[in-house]
Amino acid sequence: DGSGGDRELHSYTYLTDSYAAGGMWERSEEFDNEQHRWDITLPLTPELGESVNQAYFFHPGQGYGEGDPRHQSRHAQILPDRGVVMALYPIPEDEDSTIVGVLPKGEWIREERALFGLACGVYLAVYLRHSYEAEEAEDRLNVRSAGEFGGVVIEAAGLEEAESLDADDLAGFAELMRGRAPVFAADGRGVSYRSLQSRRLE
């Protein structure tokens, strides 16, 4: 039921020298639901400036206000694995299907259903099931994507990992990742993806 209650909650964290990725397998109902369920976190360095140091998406729930990236709903299924987080949003028909995302400031290549970025020495590939709108804010890139059974897959890679795959800059990383786009099920209830570490995720 997504309420959490007294049941045990399980978290997943993957740490590298460049970033951390992870999330909560289960959602816990908490006061105001201010916590997001998963994220990729970059190191706090002077290079970031005033930018946020996290990348995450969620479906807004009760208490959400425009521009305030908190207060998620209970409609999310996630699979974190190493530097990848996959999330599906099975939102009921009577609710707004828009999911919102927060990305760190950096250099971004925007495509119809994907964004490829470089922020604080970390490459990020962001794939969405539906098209999106992205707006630059003072400290972040705000993303909105609407459509039934939305989904997102994010993979992070450090500079050395990307270079080992012959991606020497953001353009090279984007070229590498374009051909690795996840396959979302026609009904939106599943997704498959092969990570940069050749792990098949479904």
Residue map of PLM features:
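Ser/Thr/Asn(+Pro)-rich, low-complexity disordered segments
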Residues: 2-202
